[in-house]
Design a protein with these regions (language model features):
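Active-site anion-handling motifs in enzyme catalytic cores
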Residues: 1-323
Length: 323
């Protein structure tokens, strides 16, 4: 029996811990689909971070380009012009070597015609072997370019399949997760006006309606506002499991980060998203269509069914390769 060598290109957790939920979920789904695999996880963060600081990327050593593997797996918002600009050369290099490209729960960034055109041209030159989308529009845009295609879901929903949360010695709590990117500018005023009229000092207090308030932030690179620490009960970490312990137990999550909502829903807890990002379409795929308008409880059976079907699709292809 052959063991498949899989190169997983991900990372960038310190810029957005939601990337960790995607990466860990994707890797777990791969192992569920095919136990006979060896996964080599290589970070794409050097190019991402160094590009922010205008570094000379021609001097970056691309470890991914020299690892011997059978498949290259990408997950998350990788179908974007920026991702292709930063990582397209190493992807093309691997495909020319005979490595098969697997997009496992992929999606776009802006979903503009310009982005779609850029990604389409890249995938025509570097066609995926397996293409699993995380939202319906992405599937419709690119599925025809792959040998095997599936209308799937975001890999972040798999976090509840591998992570066992700790018991917390805490009263009931809610999570507020708002970063200065990715959502409406006036979320603070909206929350106070529409959700917490009883307490106008919500963002300086530690409780609301008898529930503890815990404030998480998903990013501290390339900047971390000092105002974060003017508020009580702040969690900022480079460890995704710290966040998952909270999202697994919260009574509700209010956020402008898509993957704070993904993780919360995955653990069968309600969430509300304060963002108009087109990436939020991935929440529609699991039935959370109202999450932008109101606190929304997950359809946990639908989430389980979607995960199971996605793993079955992947398993049928990969297991056959190992036999």
């Amino acid at each position: 029996m052959k063991t498949l060598r899989i190169l997983y290109l991900g990372g960038g957790w310190i810029t957005n811990i939601g990337n960790a939920f995607i990466d860990l979920g994707s890797i777990h789904s791969l192992r569920m689909a095919c136990p006979d695999i060896q996964i080599y996880f290589v970070s794409d963060m050097p190019r991402v971070i160094f590009s922010i600081f205008r570094a000379n990327l021609s001097n970056v050593f691309d470890l991914a380009g020299v690892i011997k593997c059978d498949h290259l797996v990408l997950s998350g918002a990788i179908l974007s012009a920026k991702f292709i600009q930063l990582n397209g050369s190493v992807i093309s290099k691997l495909i020319k070597k005979g490595v098969k490209l697997i997009i496992n729960g992929g999606g776009g960034s802006t979903y503009t015609e310009e982005e779609i055109d850029t990604v389409t041209r890249f995938l025509r030159k570097n066609p995926p072997y397996i293409f699993i989308s995380r939202d319906r529009q992405t599937f419709e845009n690119y599925s025809y370019l792959s040998e095997y295609s599936y209308d799937g879901i975001d890999c972040g929903f798999f976090v509840s399949d591998f992570f066992v949360p700790a018991e917390l010695d805490l009263p009931d709590f809610i999570v507020l997760n708002f970063d200065p990117i990715g959502g409406p500018f006036n979320y603070l005023a909206f929350l106070i006006k529409h959700l917490f009229d009883k307490n106008k000092k919500l963002f300086r207090t530690s409780t609301i309606d008898g529930k503890l308030i815990i404030r998480t932030h998903h990013s501290f690179i390339p900047f971390m506002p000092h105002r974060y620490f003017r508020e009580a009960n702040v969690l900022i970490s480079d460890n995704p499991y710290d966040y998952l312990n909270l999202y697994a137990h919260t009574k509700a999550t209010y956020s402008n980060r898509v993957h704070a909502c993904v993780a919360t829903l995955a653990f069968n807890n309600p969430a509300r998203l304060f963002s108009n990002t087109p990436r939020a379409a991935l929440l529609d795929r699991v039935g959370a269509n109202t999450i932008r308008e109101k606190l929304t409880y997950p359809d946990i059976q639908k989430i389980r069914d979607e995960k199971l079907n996605q793993v079955k699709f992947l398993s049928k292809i990969l297991v056959e390769e190992t036999s």
